[in-house]
Amino acid sequence: MKLPVLDKNFYPMIKALNDFDAEVNKNGNPVKVTLVAERSGGYNYVYTYNALPDGVNDALNFRVAERLSKTILWVVGGFKIYVAGSKSIYEYLKNAYTLDGIRAFDVDFMSGVYEKPFEVVWLNEDEVPAQKNASIRVGGYLDGCRIGFDAGGSDRKVSAVINGEVVYSEEVVWNPKITEDPTYHYNEILTAMKTAASKMPTVDTIGVSSAGVYVDNKIMVASLFLKVDKSKHGDYVKNMYINVAKEMSQIYGKEIPLEVANDGDVTALAGAIDLNDNGVLGIAMGTSEAVGYINSNGGINGWLSELAFAPVDFNENAMQDEWSGDFGVGCKYFSQDAVIKLAEYGGFKFEDGLTPAQKLKVIQALMAKDDPLAAQIYEDIGVYLAHTIPFYAKFYDIKHMLLLGRVMGGKGGDIILATCKKVLAEEYPEFAGLDIGLPDENSRRVGQSIAAASLPASK
């Protein structure tokens, strides 16, 4: 197996699952286990696999169940996990998903998103439900004068779009993740909107692409507000985009439709519009890993797709994510953090006091000069990606894969793509024909805000 040169202990989830399947087959007494994640509206996701019998290597059995259940939660979302097939796996997960358990972060996050207490429930085999999917139409509207705003962790982008033509776009550096006062966030967002509006005769709609989880345009969870005290989250943070749109509506004396979507889904939407096709998985590698999906019907599934928190590395000593407290999750493999991590693994010493965005720029500058360590960093991220695509494909039906974000900029992005394709062809030939690509440099940088502009239907 081709491993990252700077991270030799990487143990891809797909390899771990294949090894586990081999172990189960060797044992000869497979136990059928079903995990069901339930979310709002009665929608659910059903995943069935074969496990070892109770009492046979319980530690491995439990770890596989825990990694799979966690992956499903961050792919699909949910406030309830049902378990059928193994009482001991059920008991283990029930203890793990508590505020005192190893999955306390997940419990707190999901109960906040869905505004319901999180629980793990036993199911008899004959009670396992059929899967119930959603498919929601998003975006692709281009009529009128539109503002598209993309709230990145390091810069904010805004576009003014008139009947599908971009008349203005800008990127402005900001620091939302280290700012405690939410009025800073509000004023920065409003300033961006007003700048775009000043380039058009009127404003008909506002579309927003932003990292995090959104329900009815409300901010349920978002890393942009990481430093804002939870007591201030209430209505002030939760309704921030709604309130900005109200202020813009007052300026123009009419109600301006607003649509807020997860930045990952907008990434995928940008790709679907560009490709004129569906089945698009978009991955934006920037401050974190943002993932979105446009299904084969051209809609979104109503899934979280917060794969920044989904495991990609089964190695128990993988790098820890500071926010979730978990190890081996996507945000440390497909983001600027991955570049920094691999640079440090390679013995590189950054100057004191640099922000993560500045550290990325240091490595990008080295890459522009064809520095061998920088090239190795990007190659290793390509190896990570090649081993992760078959794991993601267990949950998403992927025809096209679109790679965006700051990490994919310049020569480094080309190395990631070329390495990924090469390793896929060698190790996973069934994925060799997958269409994986980068948008051109301009749409790479501002494509998100332009796609965001297409989100709302006009009145």
Report residues per predicted region.
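Transmembrane beta-strands of outer-membrane beta-barrel proteins
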Residues: 147, 206, 281-285
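Gly/Ser/Thr-rich active-site cleft segment
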Residues: 202-240, 287, 331, 336, ...
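ATP-binding/phosphotransfer module of carbohydrate and carboxylate kinases, centering on a glycine-rich
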Residues: 1-173, 178-205, 213, 250-253, ...
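Short, flexible micro-motifs
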Residues: 155-156, 210-215, 285, 289-293, ...
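Phosphate-binding/catalytic loop of phosphoryl-transfer enzymes
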Residues: 141, 217-325, 450-459
